[in-house]
Amino acid sequence: MRKILYIHGMGGGADSRIPSILQECISNPVVVRTYDFDPEIAAVQIASWVNEVRPALIIAESLGSLHALRLEGLPIIFVSPALNAPYYFRFLSWTTFLPVMTPLLDRIYKPRSGDRQQLHFTFRVLRKYRRHRIEAMKTVRNTSYENQVFAFFGTDDHYRKQGVVSIKTWKKHFGDTFSVYKGTHFMEEEYVRSILVDKVLEVLDNNK
């Protein structure tokens, strides 16, 4: 049976909410694993999982979207793609020279307990996200995404106000291949069970 690889967002992990709901709704196995916050390490991890799992579809949430864009040849569904997060991280990276900032950021963004990505906001790690975005956009320029990508954005996504999540940025690269739901950055269960499940089944059916 064809598998789905789910790439979680910042602080997510193997027990993230959306993939667990998806698995209740569809018969295809949904594979989700916890990757490192360091994007260089994570890129290697995710590439190896793609080779192992051989997914028919990638679903990428929030910060995981940049990792998905570095992959080629697979259809991708995006949930609240945070394509501009590296710009925000660039600013945060300089603040970490203040001794209080790294422990403060670690506390503010501390993930829930469980099998979750461990977050440690150091200058070294945050600065790597600039190169990470460059590599993702390089792949975008060299790849034809016709009928291969689709994104969902929430009307009340607080990261859209900061520009971290941006419909304008999405349209620049992928046109009108998106839909907006009346919800937040973290897609609510009712939308996972309706619009996301419907899109997953549609993409799988179109890519047999």
Residue ranges and their predicted role:
Residues 1-3, 146-147:
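A short, charged/proline- and glycine-enriched loop
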Residues 6-10, 59, 152-154:
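Short hydrophobic segments within beta-strands
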Residues 71-72:
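Aromatic pocket-lining residues of Rossmann-like dinucleotide-binding sites
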Residues 75-77, 81-207:
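The alpha/beta-hydrolase serine catalytic core
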Residues 2-53, 185:
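Active-site catalytic motif of lipid deacylating hydrolases and related acyltransferases
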Residues 58-68:
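Gly/Ala-rich beta-loop-alpha elbow adjacent to hydrolase catalytic centers
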Residues 56-59, 75-77:
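Residue in the alpha/beta-hydrolase core beta-strand immediately N-terminal to the catalytic nucleophile
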Residues 15, 19, 23, 68, ...:
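Short, highly selective alpha-helical patches that border small-molecule cofactor pockets
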